[in-house]
Design a protein with these regions (language model features):
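Conserved SAM-binding motif I beta-strand of class I
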Residues: 91-96
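Alpha-helix termini
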Residues: 52, 86-90, 126
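Class I SAM-dependent transferase core
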Residues: 2-66, 104-115
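S-adenosylmethionine
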Residues: 97-156
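Conserved class I S-adenosyl-L-methionine
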Residues: 66-75
């Protein structure tokens, strides 16, 4: 069972270009480094995170429609950062209200040179028409907030 990020990436992603592998390696190194102090991902188990979180995020790319995406409650950038890496021609908005997550996302954006990413510190309940994108995604998001929304609000 491989334990280093590079070996796990090779095992999981069979046709990954060197460029994409390099970007994922940088991102994952940052993610696990920050996780030690900020708890920004579900697990410190690298193999689990890559196989379960990163690869699942990558698989979303074939289902995504439109030219722009908003990742609500982006946290550590999953799936938003992964979508941005594999879709450099698409705009990706990473939305979170926690300063520690925003700091990480800004650093990841800079380190990965992701010009297609816009990091926004804001609660998703604040309606901002400037943040309108073609597709909205979220994962590990509290149902309490969604359950308070009207039917129409869930699709706006």
């Amino acid at each position: 069972m491989p334990t280093d990020v590079s070996s796990i990436l090779n095992e999981v992603f069979h046709n990954l270009t060197e460029d994409k592998k390099h970007l994922l390696q940088i991102y994952l190194d940052l993610l696990f480094k920050w996780h030690k102090t900020s708890n920004i991902v579900s697990s410190s188990d690298k193999e689990y995170v890559i196989k379960r979180e990163v690869y699942d995020s990558y698989k979303l790319t074939k289902f995504m429609r439109g030219q722009s995406y908003t990742d609500i409650g982006s946290g550590g950038g999953l799936p938003g950062i992964i979508l941005a890496i594999f879709n450099p021609e698409k705009e990706v908005v990473l939305l979170d209200r926690k300063s520690s997550f925003i700091d990480f996302l800004e650093l990841a954006k800079a380190e990965l040179m992701l010009d297609n990413v816009n990091v926004v510190k804001q609660d998703f309940l604040v309606k901002d028409t400037q943040l309108m994108t073609d597709t909205v995604i979220f994962k590990n998001f509290s149902n309490k907030l969604i359950s308070k929304m009207t039917y129409e609000e869930k699709f706006i």
